[in-house]
Amino acid sequence: MSQTHRILLLNGPNLNMLGAREPKHYGSISLESIEEKIQTLATQHNVKVECFQANSEEKLINKIHESFQQVDFILINPAAYTHTSVALRDALLAVSIPFVEIHLSNVHKREPFRHHSYFSDVAEGVICGLGAKGYEFAFLFAMDYLAKK
């Protein structure tokens, strides 16, 4: 019997404002539309995806902790926490769930403070600057990764 893989899609602060927030950097697509696309892909691949967005570090950390031994892969856009949150990094390391770091914009073409990530060196991969398509690429990478386990 084949196992149905479980993926957690985590989105950090202000991503609930996608579509209205700085379309020059983030495009005009809503987070809801991104989540719907990932759910469609999940159905096509017989995978369960839970989507979660929070504007607070505590809620994101708690969700990661709840995922321990419950989730096979995490897709995370830490948003502004990318550059500030050792706590989120530590939570991901604590649960030992492989993850991909996603950014809609190319953080390396933006302000210098956005160039550093507390996640990149411990992520399976990093996707940035590809807009909403980056979520799809991250999902497909997760499928390949899990197929090889």
UniProtKB/Swiss-Prot annotation:
InterPro entries this protein is in?
DHquinase_II, DHquinase_II_CS, DHquinase_II_sf
Pathway terms, separated by semicolons: Metabolic intermediate biosynthesis; chorismate biosynthesis; chorismate from D-erythrose 4-phosphate and phosphoenolpyruvate: step 3/7
One Pfam entry for this protein is DHquinase_II
Q: Which reaction does it catalyse?
A: 3-dehydroquinate = 3-dehydroshikimate + H2O
Q: Report whether Iron shows up as a keyword of the record.
A: no
Tell me the keywords, alphabetical order.
Amino-acid biosynthesis, Aromatic amino acid biosynthesis, Lyase
Question: Which Cys pairs does UniProt list as disulfide-bonded?
Answer: none
Q: Where does this protein hold substrate?
A: N77, H83, D90, L104, S105, R114
Q: Where does the record place the site Transition state stabilizer? A: R21
A GO MF label: 3-dehydroquinate dehydratase activity
A GO BP term here is:
chorismate biosynthetic process
Give a yes or no for keyword Cytoplasm in this entry.
no
Enzyme Commission number? 4.2.1.10
Role, per record: Catalyzes a trans-dehydration via an enolate intermediate.
Subunit and partners: Homododecamer.
* Family listed: Belongs to the type-II 3-dehydroquinase family.
Q: What is this protein called?
A: 3-dehydroquinate dehydratase
Recorded source organism is Haemophilus influenzae (strain PittGG)
